[in-house]
Amino acid sequence: MLQVYLVRHGETQWNAERRIQGQSDSPLTAKGEQQAMQVGERARSLGITHIISSDLGRTKRTAEIIAQACGCDITFDFRLRELDMGVLEKRQIDSLTEEEEGWRRQLVNGTQDGRIPGGESMQELSDRVHAALASCLELPQGSRPLLVSHGIALGCLVSTILGLPAWAERRLRLRNCSISRIDYQESQWLASGWVVETAGDVSHLDTPALDELQR
């Protein structure tokens, strides 16, 4: 059975400012760096063999801190990037016009093929994060990878593994530097394929980030 750990990046400046990040970027806060160090301490006891990270700056930095703790190399995979939020990226939630808020709600509330202008749909996000996950099956036997990604991307992945629509990620609370675990199993008696073992564990953190943006 392959165990794969999923980690959301540490708190960023834009998380704290309630600003939409998407595939744009802002640096980790001091709290975000501390959260990543606490993930590293936990990861050291989990037997992690590979770290695979989104290539955006906030995930890169989170992965670097974790890698220092557990002594693993990092592979960067663009398929683990956050949802492309198009023309709304870098905007503060409270500054959106009624029309812009409508675009955002269409996307996150499950409108079929909904997307923000210039961005991508939840189905497109789901397709690429599942492709990244499938690559873990090609790792050597006995591997235990840790994937560093983003709130919407990881929520979409966990939701769809559970058989829910991609936009059901809104119902998952994956806080900054939370740890989830999914397993790949082959069994005649249990569900074969990917199963969710845990989601959104923050027991390793002193104080979880207070942001609710999930991105």
From Swiss-Prot:
**Protein name per its UniProtKB record:** Probable phosphoglycerate mutase GpmB
Primary gene name:
gpmB
Q: What are the EC numbers?
A: 5.4.2.-
Q: Which GO terms describe its biological process?
A: glycolytic process
Q: Where is this site: Transition state stabilizer?
A: H150
Catalytic reaction list: (2R)-2-phosphoglycerate = (2R)-3-phosphoglycerate
Alphabetized, the UniProt keywords read: Glycolysis, Isomerase
Q: Where is the active site?
A: H9, E82
A Pfam family that the UniProt record links to this protein: His_Phos_1
Q: Does the keyword Protease apply?
A: no
Q: Output the Gene Ontology cellular-component terms.
A: cytoplasm
Query: Which InterPro entries does the protein's record reference?
Result: His_Pase_superF_clade-1 (IPR013078), His_PPase_superfam (IPR029033), PG/BPGM_mutase_AS (IPR001345), PGM_Phosphatase (IPR050275), Phosphoglycerate_mutase_GpmB (IPR023086)
Q: Could you say which residues bind substrate here? A: 8-15, 21-22, 58, 60, 82-85, 104-105, 151-152
Q: Could you confirm whether the keyword Metal-binding appears in this record?
A: no
In which pathway is this protein known to take part? Carbohydrate degradation; glycolysis; pyruvate from D-glyceraldehyde 3-phosphate: step 3/5
Q: Which domain of life is it from?
A: Bacteria
Stated family: Belongs to the phosphoglycerate mutase family. GpmB subfamily.
Q: Which GO terms describe its molecular function?
A: phosphatase activity; phosphoglycerate mutase activity
